[in-house]
Amino acid sequence: MTANLRVVPDEQSLGAAGADIVCDVVRAVPNAVITFATGQSGVPIYRALAERVERREIDFSRVRVFELDGYVGIPLADRRSLYGWLKRDVIVPLRIPEGDITRLRGEASDPVAACREYDRALDRAGGYDLAILGLGPNGHVAFNEPPADPQSDAHVLDVTEESVESAVRYWGSREQVPRRAVTTGLRRLIAAGRVLLVARGEAKRTALERALGSDADPMTPASFLNRSADVTFLTDLPMR
């Protein structure tokens, strides 16, 4: 299916629009299986959701969270771990019990086995009800880097140089950015009941335009999301 493109004027509007979609899913399925992107893309949405939780407009206490991706070999105690981001931006402010979180354990001694374990757990849960995703400057979603395989399950991968460069601001230098990662697979994201892809800032324009222009470009992994049954691309970029 062709993506539903929603363009909003500013960050606050983006947060509200994204939060509306998330709340619709959780109200319909209180124990929904949701995967949340870490990083800056989803922050306005998570802040808007936290405000609604504080006002008791929505309850995430039964939501089941599946970690989207992570770096290989980075301990959970490291604040730069993607689970650390998830906990600070989503788990704590939305009051989600940590017992309802399924990890994609990049810190495991055998990350390949951890990926298989994750997919088995996702199968038992019935797949994602909602996938909240950011868009990488090279078109990646989660750590599904180009060239991407739309039939992929959770896997270990080498991080591309483009993704290394975009992560330098969090790690301090190129040398410190991890070069290996684990990620859920595109096949699982495409099959999600609902997909919300967020593109913020001018640096994402080219990737967004390419994603909207195709449903089968391995060099733009996000383009495969057009095959999803219900996908919204949400952006604050004025479209030409």
Which positions does each model-derived feature cover?
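Short, well-ordered alpha-helices that flank and scaffold nucleotide-derived cofactor binding pockets
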Residues: 20, 24, 47-54, 88, ...
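Local beta-strand N-terminus motif with an aromatic residue
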Residues: 61-62, 128
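N-terminal glycine-/serine-/threonine-rich phosphate-binding loop
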Residues: 1-34
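Structural beta-sheet core signal
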Residues: 36, 65-67, 197, 233
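Glycine-rich N-terminal segment of FAD-binding domains in flavoprotein oxidoreductases
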Residues: 28-54
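Conserved phosphate- and dinucleotide-binding cores of soluble alpha/beta proteins
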Residues: 2, 6, 13-14, 73-240
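Glycine-rich, flexible N-terminal cofactor/catalytic loop recognition
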Residues: 51, 57-58, 71
